[in-house]
Amino acid sequence: MKTNLWNGFIDVVKREVVPALGCTEPVSVALAAAIAVEKLNGTVEKITALVSPNLMKNGMGVGVPGTGMVGLPIAAAVGAIAGEANAQLEVLKNITPEDVAHAKILIDAGNVHVGVADVNNILYAKVTVTSGDEFVAVTIADSHTHVMAIEENGITTYIAEPANTATSVKKTSPFEGALLEDIYDFALNAPLEEICFIEHAAELNDALSEEGLTGKYGLQIGATFQRNVDRGLLSGGLLTDVLRRTAAASDARMDGAMKPAMSNSGSGNQGIAATMPVVVVADFLKVDKEKTIRALMLSHLTAIYIKSHQNKLSALCGATTASMGAVAGMTWLLGGDLNKINNAICSMIGDIAGIICDGAKTSCAMKVSSSAGSAVKSALMALDGIYVTGNEGIVADNADASIRNLSALANGSMTQTDVQILDIMVNK
């Protein structure tokens, strides 16, 4: 076992698995606005946000918590008026109806402008707040909370190194020389007291799932499953429970519920996808606390490992790759070993590779539930010795190589897909 990797694994999970209130792309805009206002003398009169095409795509149609509205203008406005900068991805946790009303007044008066920035950064937001002749601009780039620069009245008062330069990644990546086998060994053998923090993911995302099951949010996918179980059109059981509880959390998340998700790799839906299927299987099997914690760690770290091969935002749906983390945790809980997990991930790549990301919105919950369903299917197949082999499509002879192939697709030809998606979205 490569125990020398373990501290790095713990650090990356603590960094990438964090609470987030609301979809993280509009929240990053709200955070930039909140930071800017802290340095502004006077009342905010005007807000301008310039964002990368990918951030625009993911912010156009998603609910902003506590506002009853969707999109980047309300995120920028309410972040400026009432955001708590030190709360990071929970920047909007204490907004009030009065704050939202104030934000709407700014928007209705034409004082909030959002546009696309001509930048190479995949994740980028520059928010400028103005009061009279004074202005403050805050730039967040490369990750959802990484402040790249602060400018006050034309003077740059802070500048940071990019969060994902080649040198910084090489220095900080815990996955140098790591394989899926090393993640498996870590999750199963690391001291429990060093990884038990991951249990908080189950607590937050299960609470979000319960909120979604009330049927008040989005497309009500989780609640739809529940209603049809009650009607007798669907049976209960493991598959239905995974779909129901996982989709419900995403329903609530994407329609602006005032409950945080535990995110993964900067995404609440990815955190939900990596958490809820594992929680449901653990509940179904009535396993003990330690086994649940180890399965959650296996899931979340595998999801981060897969995502580390890809751009932070891309045309490839992140719920699909996060669910490949979930299949690792589920397969292990159901009695599978590393070989079975390997095969299950390969089957998922053979099943759902290439599902596009066309922005954050309520219908993301459908992709989350589809990915969770693929995870259940692939886990059960693997336990019976059935899987997609390296003779088929982009799937290789092992999960590590298959992940690299999937990521080559995401980082290569799908970059043009991303351009086409945004063009369709802004011109339809």
Swiss-Prot record:
Domain of life of the organism encoding this protein: Bacteria
Pfam families: SDH_alpha (PF03313)
Listed GO biological process terms: L-cysteine catabolic process to pyruvate
InterPro entries: Ser_deHydtase-like_asu (IPR005130), UPF0597 (IPR021144)
A GO molecular-function annotation: L-cysteine desulfhydrase activity
Family the UniProt entry places it in: Belongs to the UPF0597 family.
HAMAP family from the UniProt entry: UPF0597
Listed name of the protein: UPF0597 protein PBPRB0240
The organism of origin for this protein: Photobacterium profundum (strain SS9)
